[in-house]
């Protein structure tokens, strides 16, 4: 195609030159000399184009070969490949990807790629401008009301109160996670079967007690504020999920090693690295970047801190003035509906800030410090046209764990036809975990998240499936997100202040689990 096109262009050029030579004009000699120069320049550009295409093709081939090598190396060496599926097994009622495993490759986070586009960076700058507006409005209101220009961080100081106690509590949680699962695995690999099973199970039981009971006891006994409780509960859930992944991935290879199949047990250094790297799927090795960009680490930590300040300003200016005295007014459906609609804007802001601060900034900072190559912690969930796609792309780190150890293992136990049951199991585990986190952080039980996630979210997952495409479905998904966040912020804020305005004269079980905002209207 190229040589023929080049000859055709050259013939047209020469034809044009010939016509110009025959034209009776005064500068005919000039046109005669310019035609060979034009032909030579065209030939030179064709040669340059061919050279550039050849170089690009070679570089692309090298990149693809390297990606294939890294993908092959990222497969766990201690596991045998899964047998091929029997003929006819890939039906509509069965799961074709039963043996699919997480493959780690070097790739950047999606927002880092989008930040290279000036148009998207402008949206980022708009959010920074919004933070500046909150700061200016806070200073202006304080100056008008009290005659001083001083930013107060009372809400931030209260939320992170007793943080050193939470960090001290983290130490035994970490040591338990570091030592108990690995030592149990070593016992199963080397000791006699009866003795190893008993000691290993005892170690894991002690590990579970430390992780489950210690943070709850510290939070209740010392009445930790919400942000300090967040540190404990997130680390508690993270350590439990990482411990399970390590044992789930390493135990099959360890049992085969006992039978003399020559499979080595996981190294302690790989397990230690796994406890800090931003993934919940254990592998002996991960793709690594060649060096650490410390300016990138500092930038992400600074952005995470900015998101925390942003959230404090949103709560202090848009939520506290509205809900602080709501429980002291008579209940009305109109006030409840208006409070939910008022909370949609701060609710969606909080959702975006949590996403950006944790899933992008925090995880990327730790990934960069540990040279962890695979930065796909999320995908383009904002473009989702179905809730099933939203749940898969919002938090890829947790989704990979649920898909590998709840959904796929559920299919292995129940059969490939039980896709619906396995999916309901994923929703149940995720909803209970989210409700437990909210209960731990806020200090009371109010199953708003459980109902929204398990009931409403489960229904929307089956109703708004992947076959729903088009802009209208994306608008509908965002509308449901706005309303859901408004319901959560409104109801949880009302319950928070109701429990402070109407304390129980005597603590009872039903008094602790019954929402106080339903009856506290003084």
From Swiss-Prot:
<feature type="transmembrane region" description="Helical; Name=5">
    <location>
        <begin position="294"/>
        <end position="326"/>
    </location>
</feature>
<feature type="topological domain" description="Lumenal">
    <location>
        <begin position="143"/>
        <end position="162"/>
    </location>
</feature>
<keyword id="KW-0882">Thioester bond</keyword>
<keyword id="KW-0443">Lipid metabolism</keyword>
<feature type="binding site">
    <location>
        <position position="389"/>
    </location>
    <ligand>
        <name>an acyl-CoA</name>
    </ligand>
</feature>
<keyword id="KW-0832">Ubl conjugation</keyword>
<feature type="binding site">
    <location>
        <position position="119"/>
    </location>
    <ligand>
        <name>cholesterol</name>
    </ligand>
</feature>
<feature type="binding site">
    <location>
        <position position="395"/>
    </location>
    <ligand>
        <name>an acyl-CoA</name>
    </ligand>
</feature>
<feature type="transmembrane region" description="Helical; Name=4">
    <location>
        <begin position="229"/>
        <end position="252"/>
    </location>
</feature>
<dbReference type="GO" id="GO:0034383">
    <property type="term" value="P:low-density lipoprotein particle clearance"/>
</dbReference>
<dbReference type="GO" id="GO:0008203">
    <property type="term" value="P:cholesterol metabolic process"/>
</dbReference>
<dbReference type="GO" id="GO:0042632">
    <property type="term" value="P:cholesterol homeostasis"/>
</dbReference>
<feature type="compositionally biased region" description="Basic and acidic residues">
    <location>
        <begin position="17"/>
        <end position="36"/>
    </location>
</feature>
<comment type="similarity">
    <text>Belongs to the membrane-bound acyltransferase family. Sterol o-acyltransferase subfamily.</text>
</comment>
<comment type="function">
    <text>Catalyzes the formation of fatty acid-cholesterol esters, which are less soluble in membranes than cholesterol. Plays a role in lipoprotein assembly and dietary cholesterol absorption. Utilizes oleoyl-CoA ((9Z)-octadecenoyl-CoA) and linolenoyl-CoA ((9Z,12Z,15Z)-octadecatrienoyl-CoA) as substrates. May provide cholesteryl esters for lipoprotein secretion from hepatocytes and intestinal mucosa.</text>
</comment>
<keyword id="KW-0012">Acyltransferase</keyword>
<dbReference type="GO" id="GO:0005783">
    <property type="term" value="C:endoplasmic reticulum"/>
</dbReference>
<feature type="topological domain" description="Cytoplasmic">
    <location>
        <begin position="189"/>
        <end position="196"/>
    </location>
</feature>
<feature type="short sequence motif" description="FYXDWWN motif">
    <location>
        <begin position="377"/>
        <end position="383"/>
    </location>
</feature>
<keyword id="KW-0256">Endoplasmic reticulum</keyword>
<feature type="topological domain" description="Cytoplasmic">
    <location>
        <begin position="465"/>
        <end position="470"/>
    </location>
</feature>
<protein>
    <recommendedName>
        <fullName>Sterol O-acyltransferase 2</fullName>
        <ecNumber>2.3.1.26</ecNumber>
    </recommendedName>
</protein>
<feature type="transmembrane region" description="Helical; Name=9">
    <location>
        <begin position="471"/>
        <end position="502"/>
    </location>
</feature>
<feature type="topological domain" description="Lumenal">
    <location>
        <begin position="327"/>
        <end position="343"/>
    </location>
</feature>
<keyword id="KW-1133">Transmembrane helix</keyword>
<feature type="transmembrane region" description="Helical; Name=3">
    <location>
        <begin position="197"/>
        <end position="220"/>
    </location>
</feature>
<dbReference type="GO" id="GO:0016746">
    <property type="term" value="F:acyltransferase activity"/>
</dbReference>
<dbReference type="GO" id="GO:0010742">
    <property type="term" value="P:macrophage derived foam cell differentiation"/>
</dbReference>
<feature type="transmembrane region" description="Helical; Name=2">
    <location>
        <begin position="163"/>
        <end position="188"/>
    </location>
</feature>
<dbReference type="InterPro" id="IPR030687">
    <property type="entry name" value="Sterol_acyltranf_meta"/>
</dbReference>
<feature type="binding site">
    <location>
        <position position="392"/>
    </location>
    <ligand>
        <name>an acyl-CoA</name>
    </ligand>
</feature>
<feature type="topological domain" description="Lumenal">
    <location>
        <begin position="503"/>
        <end position="522"/>
    </location>
</feature>
<feature type="topological domain" description="Lumenal">
    <location>
        <begin position="221"/>
        <end position="228"/>
    </location>
</feature>
<feature type="modified residue" description="Cysteine sulfenic acid (-SOH); alternate">
    <location>
        <position position="277"/>
    </location>
</feature>
<dbReference type="InterPro" id="IPR014371">
    <property type="entry name" value="Oat_ACAT_DAG_ARE"/>
</dbReference>
<feature type="topological domain" description="Lumenal">
    <location>
        <begin position="443"/>
        <end position="448"/>
    </location>
</feature>
<feature type="binding site">
    <location>
        <position position="407"/>
    </location>
    <ligand>
        <name>an acyl-CoA</name>
    </ligand>
</feature>
<dbReference type="GO" id="GO:0015485">
    <property type="term" value="F:cholesterol binding"/>
</dbReference>
<feature type="topological domain" description="Cytoplasmic">
    <location>
        <begin position="1"/>
        <end position="120"/>
    </location>
</feature>
<keyword id="KW-0558">Oxidation</keyword>
<feature type="transmembrane region" description="Helical; Name=1">
    <location>
        <begin position="121"/>
        <end position="142"/>
    </location>
</feature>
<keyword id="KW-0808">Transferase</keyword>
